[in-house]
């Protein structure tokens, strides 16, 4: 389906399946509705190859690459916390931020943004290969051009990020 939004042309695809068994499996394994999505527990103990494939699929579909920043936005905070945990398993530090919905959409859910910046975007780009070609080309540029050796906002000690504790 091709549509124009704010002067931009967007292409979207829809996949429909008619299997009660598959629907029940996906509902139990991945959650229901946008705000109910999550990373299944099995993914956290999976081999790195599986984790890289899951991150590839998620960011190829719902992520974006702009400059040296890789990001994803969701109304499901628990989904992005799971993605953040999977990224940490491959040595990539991510930040999470809550974003209030626009006043134009008073019934919209709170949005959550996961960002990978600094040298962690280079680590991510060197490990995760995207199936979406345009995003992969942008990741290749991060690997080729990024000279960042550490994150300017966070100190590290060995492989531990020393981010501030905001509350307990």
Predicted regions and their residues:
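Internal intein/HINT superfamily modules and their associated LAGLIDADG
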Residues: 1-168
């Amino acid at each position: 389906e091709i549509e124009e939004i704010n002067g931009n042309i967007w292409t979207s695809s829809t996949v429909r399946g008619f299997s009660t068994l598959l629907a029940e499996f996906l509902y139990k394994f991945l959650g229901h509705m946008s705000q109910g999505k999550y990373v299944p527990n099995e993914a956290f103990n999976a081999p790195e190859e599986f984790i890289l494939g899951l991150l590839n699929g998620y960011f190829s579909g719902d992520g974006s690459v702009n400059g040296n920043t890789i990001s994803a936005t969701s109304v499901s905070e628990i989904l992005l916390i799971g993605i953040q945990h999977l990224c940490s398993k491959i040595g990539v530090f991510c930040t999470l931020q809550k974003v209030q919905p626009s006043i134009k959409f008073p019934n919209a859910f709170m949005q959550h943004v996961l960002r990978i910046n600094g040298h962690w975007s280079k680590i991510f780009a060197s490990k995760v290969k995207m199936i979406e070609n345009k995003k992969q080309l942008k990741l290749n540029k991060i690997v080729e051009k990024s000279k960042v050796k550490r994150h300017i906002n966070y100190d590290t000690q060995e492989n531990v990020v020393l981010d501030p504790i905001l509350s307990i």
